[in-house]
Structures are given as structure tokens and as C-alpha cells.
Amino acid sequence: AGIMITASHNPAKYNGFKAYGPDGCQMTDDAAAIVYDQIQKTDVLTGAKYISFAEGVAKGLIQFVGEDCKEALYEATEARQVRPGLCKTAGLKLVYSPLNGTGLVPVTRVLSDIGITDITIVPEQEYPNGYFTTCSYPNPEIYEALEKGLELAKKVGADLMLATDPDADRVGIAMKCPDGSYELVSGNEMGVLLLDYICAGRIEKGTMPKNPVAVKSIVSTPLADLVAKYYGVELRHTLTGFKWIGDQIAQLEANGEEERFIFGFEESYGYLAGSYVRDKDAVVGSMLICEMAAYYRSIGSSIKQRLEEIYAQYGRFLNQVDSYEFAGLSGMDKMAGIMNTLR
């Protein structure tokens, strides 16, 4: 079990922690309730113990992740390529922003490993800054978080602009159109595009497992159901929250069938293509988005053109996501009241 200290894709004032179980998946409700109950029993003035970071290291209570672990993660991520080697000759030109978060090293390392080296980083958003001074809401779902990246993409003529949120589990993109403008791709659109690309590519390469499984949240586009059915993939539906997608992987693993899992996504820009981790992963998402762009470019097509072909085949699905903020403890109570009324 462990925690990740992060504000995620939210404003800095929401800095807190995500709790993970021993399988690397965010805790589901029953386990989280046990942790929350213990927190409620702790007196914040007398019950919480404190030592300095340096003392924690000296006592062996804090240990740094070794290079062997990092290399294993990179290897597992790069193993999820659908068409290995394709990107080395694609000549893809990319602008990337880690939005002052943690994505810079892992994203650029993996992209470089698979052959994408023409990467321009948004300079103001290159290095970690927990105050998010360049955009107060570092969520790649919203236009404001992508503004600096889009400006730079237009300046250098990039084929794609990618942005990962500060804890690098969500990735947003803008694609270059024939007229030189840039069009944002929604999480629903990208989820369907990646599902289609992975299915078609793995069938072509003979790497599709028997009885493949994909997973999406119930609030994500039903277009994915049609795509999955076309390719003979079982598509499972979960409640909102990637922990439930991770839980589906755990259920497959319990039966020795985790290799059946090929892809999971949520409309909120979260993607995962493998069982090596149990949370949405912007590193593998960025890699597959770039590979997909390189592939369509190599056959004289584009991400935009493939999306239109998908709509022509299955029908056009329009989606709109509205976000509402309920601040503080009173906001949590208000949200709970709204949900109870809906139920």
C-alpha cells in the first residue's frame, strides 16, 4: 500500500494524497473507508507524529526508487507498442507540456526510446512547480491549460501538441489540421481512436489475446461499445473512477487472465493499455497517441481522417462534458446531497 502526494489536475490548493492498495490500484470504497475511519480517529494536534525528511531517510523509513524499477517500468510501457519501430522513420514533430508536473522525464524518455526525438518543450511549463504559476487549473481537458502549448505548436509547426497533467496520468492533445489550425481531441474521441487503433493493429500483427477485454466507465461514450463489438472485444463498464478499471484488471489477474486486458479509458483523458500498472497512465497514453499519429501519417491519412471514418462506419456521437466545482467541506456535503437525491 502507498500514497501519492499530489493536487493531480486540480488547483494547487487541493494538494492532498491518493491512497493505493498493494496491487498498485487506487483503493476502492471498502478499503478507502477503513483508511478514512482511522484518519477520523486521529487527533490532528496530538496524534500525528512528525519527523524531518532527512531524519526519515537516515532511519531508513524513506527509500528512493532504484533505477532498476524505473527501467522495468519503461520496458513494460514500451512493450505496449502496437507497431514497434514505426516511429523511428515517421518524422513526427511534437510540442509537449508537462504542465509544471512530473511528466517531463518519463514521457520524453519513452518517446525518445521509440524514435520520436523532435520534441519541443513548453519552456514555462517544463519543470515541476507545485504552485502551477502558468495556469491555475492544470487540467489538459480545458483550453486554458493548453494555451501556451498551442501557441508554441503554431510557432514551430508541430504535428501534435501533447500536455500531461501534473501527476502524469491524464493526457490531452491538439492535432494540426490541413489549414494549419489546431483542433483539440476530446477524451471520448481519443478513447475510441485508441481502442480502434489497438484492436486493428494487434489483429494485424497477430498479438491480440484470446477473448480480449477492454474497460470503460459508464459515463464514457457508447461509441466504444460499437467499436469493441466490431473487433470481437468484450467491453466492460465500470463506475466513474479509474480504480474500478484497475479492479477489473485485478479480477482478471485473480483468474490468471490479466493478458486479456488490452485497453481501458475514461472520458476525462485517462488511458491504460496493459496490466503492468493499475491506474490511468499518461506515459503509455502519450506513446500510443504518437504511434497512432505516425501510423496514419505513414499510410497517407491522419488522426482526424480516421475519426471521420469511424463516424462514417458507426454513426456520429456528440458528447459534452460539464464540470461543476463545490469548494470545501460544505461542497462535499452539497455533492453528497445531490447524489442522494438522484439515487
What are these regions (language model features)?
Residues A1-D43, N139-A163, A168, V192-I198, ...:
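Phosphate/diphosphate-binding loops
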Residues T6, N10-A12, G47-I51, I121-E126, ...:
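Core alpha/beta catalytic barrel or barrel-like domain that forms the active/cofactor pocket
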Residues A7-N10, L94, P98-V110, P166, ...:
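Conserved phosphate/anionic-ligand binding catalytic regions in large, soluble enzymes, centered on
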Residues K13-A19, Q40, V105-V110, Y131-C135, ...:
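Short acidic, glycine/serine/threonine-rich loops at helix termini
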Residues N15-A153:
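Gly/Ser/Thr-enriched, mixed-charge loops and adjacent short helices
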Residues Q26, D30-I34, D68-A72, G101-P106, ...:
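Conserved active-site and cofactor/substrate-binding residues in soluble primary-metabolism enzymes
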Residues M27-T28, C177-I203:
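Cysteine protease catalytic core and zymogen-processing segment of caspase-like enzymes
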Residues K154, A158-L160, S181-E183, G201-R343:
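Phosphate-binding and adjacent anionic-ligand microenvironments
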